[in-house]
C-alpha cells in the first residue's frame, strides 16, 4: 500500500481512538481533530505516543465550515493531502421529543450531520483530482431503525447515509468511494458504563450474537473500506451490529 494520509474526526473518543490506532498499524499516517478548548488533547497525544503512536491532532470545530477549512489547510501544508476521510465526530442529546429544545436538536444535527458536509467539502476536490479517495461516514444502527428519545440523533445518522448515496454517484468515476457504516452497541467506555443489569436485561437480548461489538471490529471494517480491495464498494451502508438490526 502506498503511504496514505487518513483524517479521523472525533478520533480521541473510544471508537475514534481504535480507528486511529488500527489504521496506524496498517501503515497509514493518521491525523485527527479535537474541539478548540479541549484541555485533554495534549494528554491524549502523550498517551498515544507512549504506546508508540505519533499522531498529529489539529483543532477544528466540526460544526463550523470555516474552522474545518482552516484545519484542512494546515493538514495539507504540514502533513499532506487527505486520502481517506473518516467522519466519526458525534454527540448525543437524548430525550423525548416532547422535552427536546431547539438547542438540543441543533447541537446534534450540526455536530453529527453538518460536520460531514463541512469536512468532506474540504478534501473531496483533491481526491477527485488525484483519482483516488475514500470517504467513510460513521452512522449508527439507530439511524437505520430509530430509537426512543433520539429523534435528533436518529435523524442526523439517517441523513448521513442519504449524503453517502447521493455523493457516491457524483464521484464514482473519479476513483473516489463514499460509504456509510452503521455500528450497533460497541464496547466503548460510554457503553460499558451502562449498569450491567441493564446490559443483561435490556440490551444484550436484542443482539443475536449475545455480546457487545469490539471497537477494533469496527476499525477493521473501516480499514477494509479504505483499501484498494474495496474499490468496487460505494454508496453502501454496512451494518456491524451483531444482528441487532437486519436490512
Task: Pin down the residues of each PLM region.
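Residue(s) in the substrate-gating loop at a strand-loop-helix junction
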Residues: 140
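Active-site helix of classical SDR
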Residues: 120, 156, 164
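Substrate-binding pocket helix/loop in short-chain dehydrogenase/reductase
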Residues: 96-97, 104-109, 191, 203
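Alpha-helical segment proximal to the catalytic Tyr-Lys
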Residues: 125, 169-173, 231
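Conserved glycine-rich cofactor-binding loop
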Residues: 12-13
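Short, small/polar-rich loop/turn modules that mediate ligand/substrate recognition or access, typified
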Residues: 172, 177, 233-235, 241
Amino acid at each position: 500500500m502506498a503511504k496514505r494520509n487518513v483524517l479521523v474526526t472525533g478520533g480521541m473518543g473510544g471508537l475514534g481512538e481504535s480507528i486511529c490506532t488500527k489504521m496506524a498499524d496498517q501503515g497509514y499516517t493518521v491525523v485527527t481533530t479535537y474541539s478548540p478548548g479541549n484541555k485533554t488533547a495534549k494528554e491524549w497525544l502523550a498517551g498515544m505516543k507512549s504506546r508508540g503512536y505519533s499522531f498529529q491532532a489539529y483543532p477544528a470545530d466540526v460544526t463550523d465550515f470555516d474552522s474545518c477549512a482552516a484545519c484542512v489547510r494546515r493538514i495539507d501544508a504540514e502533513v499532506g493531502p487527505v486520502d481517506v476521510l473518516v467522519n466519526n465526530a458525534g454527540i448525543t442529546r437524548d430525550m423525548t421529543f416532547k422535552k427536546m429544545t431547539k438547542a438540543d436538536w441543533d447541537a446534534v444535527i450540526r455536530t453529527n450531520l453538518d460536520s460531514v458536509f463541512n469536512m468532506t467539502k474540504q478534501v473531496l476536490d483533491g481526491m477527485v483530482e488525484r483519482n483516488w479517495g475514500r470517504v467513510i461516514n460513521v452512522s449508527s444502527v439507530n439511524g437505520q431503525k430509530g430509537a426512543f428519545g433520539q429523534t435528533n440523533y436518529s435523524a442526523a445518522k439517517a441523513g448521513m447515509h442519504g449524503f453517502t448515496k447521493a455523493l457516491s454517484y457524483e464521484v464514482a468515476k473519479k476513483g473516489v468511494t463514499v460509504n456509510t457504516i452503521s455500528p450497533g452497541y460497541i464496547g466503548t467506555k460510554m457503553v460499558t458504563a451502562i449498569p450491567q443489569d441493564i446490559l443483561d436485561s435490556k440490551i444484550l437480548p436484542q443482539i443475536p450474537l449475545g455480546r457487545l461489538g469490539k471497537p477494533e471490529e469496527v476499525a477493521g471494517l473501516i480499514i477494509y473500506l479504505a483499501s484498494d480491495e474495496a474499490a468496487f464498494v460505494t454508496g453502501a451502508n454496512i451494518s456491524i451490529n451483531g444482528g441487532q438490526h437486519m436490512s
